[in-house]
A protein has these predicted regions:
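C-terminal accessory segments of proteins
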Residues: 4-172
Length: 172
């Protein structure tokens, strides 16, 4: 839930229908099914893997986790103090998707919460329309996104621990 595009649809399947140039990788259509109008890389894909993997490029996953723990140690106390509030967490991450994922582009992507396409060729060809915007994830976006993703991972770790600890208390 703490990956922002898992908490929003936006008429583009949570960024799956938003082709982006990621650093030096141009978006390419699916070679087996170009009629689907889905491209790689896309916004959801880079938030799922590329941003975090690039951010931890200089370290291994354990060291990266330790770095996040250290970086967000002060904030983690307030996350714990707030208790388990799953609905609030979902809205918090949804708002993060709007402000820190979509609004971070110079070419604006409108927020369309009520449109739920089945694929990228739906919603008046959302995949093709987004492709024509030529959106680019540059170093500045990558840097901001890495901070957002890192915070989301730290929050998710603390909150998952809270849920598991509560479950362990309930089922000795």
């Amino acid at each position: 839930m703490h990956q922002p595009l898992h908490a929003i649809n936006n008429g583009d399947n949570g960024g799956n229908c938003v082709p982006v140039k990621y650093l030096h990788h141009e978006p390419l259509p699916n070679p087996l099914h170009p009629e689907r109008e889905d491209y790689s890389p896309n916004l959801h894909q880079i938030w799922d893997t590329e941003i975090v993997e690039r951010d931890m490029e200089i370290s291994n996953p354990h060291r990266y986790a330790d770095e996040l723990d250290e970086k967000f140690r002060a904030e983690s106390a307030s996350w714990e103090a707030a208790g388990i509030q799953v609905d609030n967490w979902a809205w918090e991450v949804h708002e993060r998707a709007e402000t820190e994922v979509y609004d971070a582009f110079s070419v604006k992507i409108p927020i369309e919460p009520d449109v739920k396409p089945k694929g990228c060729s739906d919603n008046n060809h959302i995949g093709k329309r987004q492709f024509e915007k030529h959106l680019t994830v540059d170093e500045a976006y990558q840097s901001r996104a890495a901070k957002t993703a890192g915070k989301g991972l730290a929050e998710a770790g603390v909150r998952l621990a809270m849920i598991l600890n509560e479950a362990a208390k309930s089922n000795p």
